[in-house]
């Protein structure tokens, strides 16, 4: 009996360890000024609690944004965001990584506003070598205007994982053997912004921004950056292969994470470029390998 209980305990510990091992490290929340600087329209950024929380304001004159001080090759980046409440049609709240040249790499979270009572749409995209057109859109399973939620990117040599409250919503694998470009040698800064995009953001541009509701306000906190900092000209990370996100358990999702991703895919996906045969009669190679992600 004792030996059976011991075996059961060992199995449970093993299962718990395997379920936890692939979860990104817990983000470290820091004040805005630790990692970030304003990018434009400085007077449209409001600071609270010693810079631990900020607001971005959008009016008919301008939006605003901020970026990291450094550029990074691989890492874990997250932001706690509370979206613009009420009638947010035409607005875009963005959290993304991007390099700085014509053939740039980019990893995007874009939150598309909507009319009061209609759900936000989260659009993700990946650019490699200046080419994007890899849009996926989902509804969120909560109201992102009521409370802060954490949006994260885990980026290593093997995959890019988009996470919402630590739940994977998308994976972009390194499939260089198929000729698919992958972001691996262009340092990227992290950018956050609130701006008007009523020419496309809501119902393809049919719903315009109602400026009588301005200013539109998005709230940010957390400001977590755990990446390998590189100069803009550097094409490699000095500690490549040695950071926690490079280890074996982060080269793929574990079984629990795959189930959560499948749940998002089945319940909340409203557009996936991999299933758009009108747009892509010949599926992109990454879609032929991984149509479910």
UniProtKB/Swiss-Prot annotation:
Xyloglucan binds at residues 110, 123-125, 133-135, 199-200, 204, 279. It catalyses: breaks a beta-(1->4) bond in the backbone of a xyloglucan and transfers the xyloglucanyl segment on to O-4 of the non-reducing terminal glucose residue of an acceptor, which can be a xyloglucan or an oligosaccharide of xyloglucan. Glycans are attached at residue 114. Residues 1-21 form the signal peptide. Induction: Up-regulated by indole-3-acetic acid (IAA). Effect of IAA is not affected by mannitol. Not up-regulated by fusicoccin. The active site is at 106 (nucleophile), 110 (proton donor). One of its GO terms (molecular function) is xyloglucan:xyloglucosyl transferase activity. It is found in: Secreted, Cell wall; Secreted, Extracellular space, Apoplast. Its EC number is 2.4.1.207. Disulfide bonds join 228-237, 274-287. Keywords: Apoplast, Cell wall, Cell wall biogenesis/degradation, Disulfide bond, Glycoprotein, Glycosidase, Hydrolase, Secreted, Signal, Transferase. Contains at least one intrachain disulfide bond essential for its enzymatic activity. Residues 23-220 form the GH16 domain. The keyword Signal applies. It holds the Pfam family Glyco_hydro_16. Catalyzes xyloglucan endohydrolysis (XEH) and/or endotransglycosylation (XET). Cleaves and religates xyloglucan polymers, an essential constituent of the primary cell wall, and thereby participates in cell wall construction of growing tissues. This is Probable xyloglucan endotransglucosylase/hydrolase protein B.
């Amino acid at each position: 009996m004792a030996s059976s209980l011991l075996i059961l305990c060992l199995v449970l510990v093993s299962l718990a360890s395997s379920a936890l091992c692939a979860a990104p490290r817990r983000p470290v929340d820091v004040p805005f000024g630790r990692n970030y600087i304003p990018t434009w329209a400085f007077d449209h950024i409001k600071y609270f609690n010693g810079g631990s929380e900020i607001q971005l304001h959008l009016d008919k004159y301008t939006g605003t944004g901020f970026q990291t001080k450094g550029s990074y090759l691989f890492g874990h980046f997250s932001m706690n965001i509370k979206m613009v409440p009420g009638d947010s049609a035409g607005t875009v709240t963005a959290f993304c990584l991007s390099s700085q040249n014509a053939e740039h790499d980019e990893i995007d979270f874009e939150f598309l506003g909507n009319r009061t009572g209609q759900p936000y749409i989260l659009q993700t995209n990946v650019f490699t070598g200046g080419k994007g057109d890899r849009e996926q859109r989902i509804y969120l399973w909560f109201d992102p205007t009521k409370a802060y939620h954490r949006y994260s990117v885990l980026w290593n040599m093997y995959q890019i994982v988009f996470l919402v409250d630590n739940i994977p919503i998308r994976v972009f694998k390194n499939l260089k053997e198929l000729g698919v470009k992958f972001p691996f040698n262009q340092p990227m800064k992290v950018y956050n912004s609130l701006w008007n995009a009523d020419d496309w953001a809501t119902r393809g541009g049919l719903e315009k921004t109602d400026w009588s509701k301005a200013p539109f306000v998005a709230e940010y906190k957390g400001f977590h950056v755990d990446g390998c900092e590189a100069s803009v000209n550097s094409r490699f990370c000095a500690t490549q292969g040695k950071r926690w996100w490079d280890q074996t358990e982060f080269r793929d999702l574990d079984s629990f994470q795959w189930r959560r991703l499948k749940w998002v895919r089945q319940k909340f996906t409203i557009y996936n470029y991999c299933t758009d045969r009108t747009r892509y009669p010949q599926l992109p190679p990454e879609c032929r390998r991984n149509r479910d992600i």
